[in-house]
Structures are given as C-alpha cells and as structure tokens.
A protein has these predicted regions:
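Arg/Lys-rich, low-complexity, intrinsically disordered basic segments
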Residues: 1-97
Length: 97
C-alpha cells in the first residue's frame, strides 16, 4: 500500500494521509490544525503525557495504519523530531511505500 502525506484541505486538521492500494483510495485527515505536537516542541514530557492520555482508549487501534489516531500517535507524537523522519519511520513500521 502506498502512503502520501500532505497538508490537510480540512480547515481544522493539520495533515492529510492518502492510502492507495490498487484501485482503492482511503483519505484521512489528522492532527488539530492549531495544536502543538512533539514534532513542534520536542518536549518528551508532553509526549509522554499525550501517549498516556490517548493509549487508554486508542491503543487497540494502533495496528491499523489508516486510522487518524494511529497517524497522530506515530507521526506527530512518535520518536522522531521532524516530519520527514516521522513519515519515513511510519512507512517502515507499517510496511508502506
């Protein structure tokens, strides 16, 4: 499956992910437009708090790369400090191109 990340066309969201698998196309918008994430502030304590807060309800979905919560968790709040590396890491984690 191929993944393309770009700026969101949704006024309230930060990024858009388009998953292409043959003729099937899935579009997901994710990340709050005005929000600050680990990619922005690089604050490990805030990242830890975000993960703890969201994993209680979202962890069961983290195996589905097309879910907005998974995209946010591993791209905006992952281990990388810049967007390009975060996307590359995400693609590797979920075997996407």
């Amino acid at each position: 499956m191929k993944l393309i990340i770009s700026n969101s066309t949704n006024k309230n969201k930060r990024l858009k992910a388009v998953f292409i698998d043959g003729n099937k196309k899935i579009t997901r918008h994710f990340g709050f437009k005005g929000g600050s994430t680990y990619i922005d502030h690089k604050d490990k304590e805030k990242r830890k708090n975000y993960r703890k807060r969201h994993e209680a309800t979202e962890k069961k979905f983290y195996t589905d790369p097309t879910r907005p919560s998974t995209l946010s968790r591993f791209i905006l709040w992952g281990n990388e400090t810049n967007l390009r590396d975060a996307i590359k890491s995400y693609k590797n984690k979920f075997n996407l191109s």
